[in-house]
Amino acid sequence: MSEARKGAYSCSFCGKLHSEVRKLIAGPRVYICNECVELCSGILQEEGRPARQGGFDLKPPEIKQVLDEYVIGQEHSKKVLSVAVYNHYKRLRNSGVISEVEISKSNVLLIGPTGSGKTLLARTLARVLQVPFAMADATTLTEAGYVGEDVENILLKLLQAANFNVEAAQRGIIYIDEVDKISRKSENASITRDVSGEGVQQALLKVIEGTVSSVPPQGGRKHPHQEFIQINTDNILFIFGGAFDGLEKIIEARNRGSCMGFEANVQKIADKRKDILCYTEPEDLVKFGLIPEFVGRIPVVTSLGRLDEETLYRILVEPKNSLVKQYTKLFEMDNLELKFDNAALLAVAKKAVARNTGARGLRAIMESLLLDFMFNPLGCEGGKVVVDAAMVEDVMMSRNCFESG
């Protein structure tokens, strides 16, 4: 089928000459080059591979079981997230089956103080489900045309996480942190433009509800003439997180003077911020500064509590990638044995509670505690480092004091 061109044979599929390829395989009146063979082989392998289901078939208890391996505490939030994610991907899996009923998307809002595990929950979910995951900071977002990131940049991050596989990205998870920082400045509409508050909420509305967005693959503002990638956000799960400092006061004010039983309950637990946040209603979020349309598109709301000493201690030792296991492995790389006694770990947890930084503060304390040993591992006697409570107190005290001279 392929004739000699000036005495040279060519591939019957791609048309490349014999001199342009590494190998040309001859058949009855046809030829195929090594490049086309490799391409065909890849196609056959991909088609023969069983469809990757990821975690789509996991039931809520199974999802929570995996979350338990990485996230300590926050039992109610893990249960809420497991059900929300299960329902979301069940909806996707049966999208071609159910025609008479259209099931809406259930985006999620996580309310909790810094270091309570909001980001870790979202990241672990993406790992469980084996779907592309992107994380964004709401404080960097502005309306289109202003200095800052466009909303489309979040979708670009998801595309990058999916290696620009649009179909995979359209089933991914986007976590937007610090969403409480884009609350509008007051409940009343302002005559001035709020480009980083209400303006961002307005820009996010269509994206989180479901629309076809034009995403610039190289970023929107520096390359205005590039080709855009169309991405449908109907099936992207959005998870929002924020500390919402001051929300508990709004909840208390709403319930002051209402039902005696509820008010008594609120007063009883007034010192436990997490318990108060359990009573969050959409109207409280609107009062805080989220616009009603935005709140309406996030039907699943759950709160995470501030972590106590016992939970922080468990975080140090129990997760698959706990800090104790991480630092033990780091020291093993220098042929050193690292040991902590329980009193030392409890002291570290106590310091984290005092700093009010939650689980995020544990690493900073551990870094400070082990700094000298990591700086000069050869100075460790007998190839062993044993950390006790007295060492924790001494090191943290010296770090908190000004050096003289």
Curated annotation (Swiss-Prot):
State the InterPro entries in the record: AAA+_ATPase, ATP-dep_Clp_protease_ClpX, ATPase_AAA_core, Clp_ATPase_C, Clp_protease_ATP-bd_su_ClpX, ClpX_bact, P-loop_NTPase, Znf_CppX_C4
Reply yes or no: does the keyword Chaperone apply. Answer: yes
Describe the location of the ClpX-type ZB domain by residue ranges: 1-52
Q: Which CDD domains does the UniProt record give?
A: RecA-like_ClpX (cd19497)
| Keyword presence, 4Fe-4S | no
Amino-acid positions noted as binding ATP in the UniProt annotation, renumbered to this chain? P113, T114, G115, S116, G117, K118, T119, L120
Entries under Pfam families matching the protein: AAA_2 (PF07724), ClpB_D2-small (PF10431), zf-C4_ClpX (PF06689)
Residues recorded as binding Zn(2+), renumbered to this chain, are: C11, C14, C33, C36
Q: Which UniProt keywords apply?
A: ATP-binding, Chaperone, Metal-binding, Nucleotide-binding, Zinc
Q: What does the record list as GO biological process? A: cell division; proteolysis involved in protein catabolic process
GO molecular function per UniProt: ATP binding; ATP hydrolysis activity; ATP-dependent protein folding chaperone; protein dimerization activity; unfolded protein binding; zinc ion binding
GO CC aspect terms: HslUV protease complex
Query: What assembly does the database describe for this protein?
Result: Component of the ClpX-ClpP complex. Forms a hexameric ring that, in the presence of ATP, binds to fourteen ClpP subunits assembled into a disk-like structure with a central cavity, resembling the structure of eukaryotic proteasomes.
PANTHER family registered for this protein in UniProt: ATP-DEPENDENT CLP PROTEASE ATP-BINDING SUBUNIT CLPX-LIKE, MITOCHONDRIAL, ATP-DEPENDENT CLP PROTEASE ATP-BINDING SUBUNIT CLPX-LIKE, MITOCHONDRIAL-RELATED
Q: What does this protein do?
A: ATP-dependent specificity component of the Clp protease. It directs the protease to specific substrates. Can perform chaperone functions in the absence of ClpP.
Record-stated family: Belongs to the ClpX chaperone family.
Name of the protein in its database record: ATP-dependent Clp protease ATP-binding subunit ClpX
What is the source species? Anaplasma marginale (strain Florida)
Q: Which gene encodes it?
A: clpX
